[in-house]
Amino acid sequence: MQFRVYSGSDGQSHIEELNLTTSDVFQFPSAQGEELVFRRDPMPGWHNCPRRQFVITLSGQAELGFGDGSTQLLGPGDISLMEDYTGQGHTTTVVQAPWLSIQISVALNAQVVSQ
């Protein structure tokens, strides 16, 4: 599944499902990757994303938690567009270890989903 995590006007992070096509995900010529990170362990506690990025779960499972009490389970192949730069942020808890993800930073002005 594909998700977008973003900061709302209420100061909370929210999640919505994205319906990306293969061409949306793998072909975005206006987007220039800025950094590529492989992460084994999540950041502790409440945190914001450090930059606009795709997070793709490679193995294991992690659960994102939000200020309203909602959660979202991420498993292998799940893609999240992380855009919650401000506010309370979200939590990330490993449910099935090892949780390995790849983080692909994307320029702020890059169009990465269909308009």
Q: What do the predicted segments below correspond to?
A:
Residues 81-82, 96-111:
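A short hydrophobic beta-strand segment most commonly corresponding to one strand
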Residues 26, 72, 88-94:
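Short, Lys/Arg- and Gly-enriched loop/turn segments at beta-strand edges
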Residues 39, 48-64, 104-106:
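Short, conserved beta-strand element in jelly-roll/cupin
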Residues 1-38:
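A short, N-terminal "cap"/entry segment at the start of jelly-roll beta-barrel domains
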Residues 9, 58, 67:
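Short, ordered coil/turn segments that flank beta-strands lining enzyme active or ligand-binding pockets
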Residues 20-22, 30-49, 83-87, 110, ...:
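Conserved short histidine dyad/triad with adjacent acidic residue
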Residues 20-22, 67-85:
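Short acidic-glycine-tyrosine-enriched beta hairpin
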Residues 43-44, 61-65, 79, 109-110:
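Short beta-strand segments in beta-sandwich/barrel cores
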